[in-house]
From Swiss-Prot:
It comes from the Archaea. Its cofactor is Mg(2+). GO terms for cellular component: cytoplasm. This is Nucleoside diphosphate kinase. SMART domains: NDK. InterPro entries: NDK-like_dom (IPR034907), NDK-like_dom_sf (IPR036850), Nucleoside_diP_kinase (IPR001564), Nucleoside_diP_kinase_AS (IPR023005). It catalyses: a 2'-deoxyribonucleoside 5'-diphosphate + ATP = a 2'-deoxyribonucleoside 5'-triphosphate + ADP; a ribonucleoside 5'-diphosphate + ATP = a ribonucleoside 5'-triphosphate + ADP. Belongs to the NDK family. One of its GO terms (biological process) is GTP biosynthetic process. The active site is at 115 (pros-phosphohistidine intermediate).
Length: 150
């Protein structure tokens, strides 16, 4: 099964949206296999967002993501990276469809609630940044055969 890294950003935590967002993933049959709340240190934030280092918004992004706790998760499921990206919606909430997480909850681009891996390579890199292998739990869902065709 494919794994994706998902992070609920400070605005999601401060606005008490975590439970509602997590329920959406579970309602779609996805499985949370790692979960933690943390205050991201600046060096980890800079490494996580390294692809934006030369962009003008980089410093604001680092300041924002380190301003309050986040919830980091590893979510597992069949083709979960593309499914989660569809569920998350467009980066700019004004362009995100209603029914997506950002379309329903996010208010502006700089405070857009959630981060999700955009590729298997990104997922692998991001998971390793936030979780040790021992923190990722494998388990069988009793309703698996109701969710996935074999």
């Amino acid at each position: 099964m494919e794994k994706s890294f998902v992070m609920l950003k400070p605005d999601a935590v401060k606005r008490r949206l975590a439970g509602r967002i997590i329920a959406r993933f579970e309602d779609r049959g996805l499985k949370i296999v790692a979960f933690k709340m943390l205050q991201i240190p600046e060096d980890l934030a800079m490494e996580h967002y390294q692809e934006h280092r030369e962009k003008p918004f980089f410093r604001d992004l680092v300041d924002y993501i380190t301003s309050a706790p986040v919830i980091a998760m590893v979510i597992e499921g069949k083709d979960c990276i593309s499914l989660i990206r569809k569920m998350v919606g467009a980066t700019n909430p004004a362009e995100a469809d209603l029914g997506t997480i950002r379309g329903d909850f996010a208010l502006e681009t700089g405070r857009n609630i959630i981060h999700a891996s955009d590729s298997p390579e990104s997922a692998e890199r991001e998971i390793k940044l936030f979780f040790d292998e021992s923190e990722i739990c494998s388990y069988e869902m009793p309703d698996r055969e109701m969710i996935y065709e074999e």
